[in-house]
Amino acid sequence: MKTIYISGPMSGIEDLNREAFESAEKKIQKMGHIALNPHRFPELETYEDYLFFDLEIIAMAADAIALLQGWENSPGSKRELAVAIQKGIEVMLIA
């Protein structure tokens, strides 16, 4: 069983792309893994607070990162991917 962080675009997308994140979460759970869905994390004050929190979660708890469609247009997803690569964390695409 792996712990998989879900990364994808949020800003500028209706309901912060919640539907795509929840769909990915269900797929990951169906495969028998633990999904780390940022929509389920605590509310924070600023974008920078969210990003710092998310990067720490990836570095400390994730075995893999699952990239949603459109991740390449998201500065936050690019930073999350960079941390995953730096830490040697598995990277996968999820639709």
Predicted segments, located by residue:
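Conserved catalytic or regulatory cores that recognize and/or transform ribose-phosphate-containing ligands
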Residues: 1-95
